[in-house]
């Protein structure tokens, strides 16, 4: 069974927080003050949970990719800055995922060199 977890970015305190419960009556606050990010049910090479909004470094067919984890039509992808999408898949062979930050605390990691 898939584990369902969320975290939020607290814009007021500028820090990431784990969601322990949700009150859907106040759901409008989630998008405005607290952007909600879902757990992908995948771990990186260091055993860290991968969430939506994480910046991930990965390899595909020996290509180095840095991008943001996002959900598209029910599937998790890594979107690089060049409008390319790569499926987020558990580690196998030469495919290795590593969380290097997130879009709120480490946006500079997405800037092209």
Segments predicted by a language model, with ranges:
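Secondary-structure transition motif
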Residues: 1-113
